A protein has these predicted regions:
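Glycine-rich, N-terminal phosphate-binding loop of Rossmann-like dinucleotide-binding domains
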Residues: 84-85, 218
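Short, solvent-exposed loop/turn elements at beta->coil junctions and helix N-caps
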Residues: 13, 60-61, 190-195
Length: 263
């Protein structure tokens, strides 16, 4: 499991003096860390290439009965893993995906203001809830001294990247209520992104129904990086037909086909 420590109010304010007054305590996860997704992905690609893996840069057009066809005209044969996030239905229309839009703000450099990634205990309710829109306090100090401020969630199947000022204001006011010093900081950039969310809130991990050579890993909402290692272990065990460390059934893409038939 993951080690966590309950802390009282005295310890909480020793850890993060800039927090708003009045909190009764919190929870410290000493080994918590922040990973920058693109850098991790590039590291893994380079590591695979150093071991003989060949990297092709192309666009996948469609799955074939024994591989995948690329836009450049090449057809690759063998097992295929589809991990394309919100774009999953382009290759696998039987597995619907919803886009859950989020806003982020990055500030100028303010080293020392915040020492830990800090979030409200109710963050999980926002992340895993089914509300059309929600906000939660989630702030990260970056190695550069900048502060990354989140988080917001709203379903946006049109995938409009435009910043919503009402949602941004709502998210920031939530953050200010936990960390008042944020109100006086200069923001450098505001942007949006989209979290791929399955229709039942559980990711698709496993073999694609009706396709022996195709596998899928998608729909993790905002926990793709956090659960990446567990997802990889589960997929490898399934591919090699080994016993899995956890029950894979709740994540089996076939559950969606079964639900459709039952309906």
């Amino acid at each position: 499991g993951i080690h966590a420590e309950a802390v009282d109010d005295t310890a909480l304010y020793q850890l993060e003096p800039a927090l708003a007054p009045g909190f009764a305590g919190g929870m410290l996860v000493p080994r918590d860390a922040v990973a920058y997704g693109p850098a991790v992905a590039m590291h893994l690609v380079e590591r695979a290439q150093s071991r003989g893996t060949r990297l092709l840069r192309d666009r996948a057009l469609r799955l074939t009965r024994d591989g995948i066809e690329l836009q450049g005209g090449q057809t690759l044969r063998g097992s295929v893993l589809v991990a394309t996030g919100c774009a999953l239905p382009e290759l696998l229309p039987a597995l619907p995906m919803r886009a859950r839009k989020g806003h982020l703000v990055i500030t100028q450099r303010y080293p020392g203001l915040l020492r830990h990634q800090t979030l409200e205990l109710g963050y999980a309710d926002s992340a895993h809830g089914s509300d059309d829109s929600s906000v939660a306090f989630n702030v990260q100090p970056r190695p550069t001294g900048q502060i990354l401020i989140g988080s917001s969630r709203e379903f946006d199947d049109a995938m409009d990247p435009a910043v919503s000022m009402p949602m941004l204001r709502r998210m920031l006011e939530r953050s200010f209520s936990y960390l008042p010093a944020l109100r006086g900081l200069d923001a450098l950039r505001v942007w949006t992104g989209f979290r791929p969310t399955s229709i039942d809130g559980r990711p698709y991990i496993g073999r694609v129904p009706g396709m022996d050579h195709a596998w899928v890993a998608a729909g993790h909402e905002g926990l793709g990086i956090t659960t990446a290692l567990g997802t990889a272990h589960l997929l490898v065990d399934l591919l090699l037909e080994r016993p899995t460390a956890i029950d894979a059934a709740p994540f089996d893409p076939a559950r969606l086909a079964a639900a459709t038939v039952a309906a």
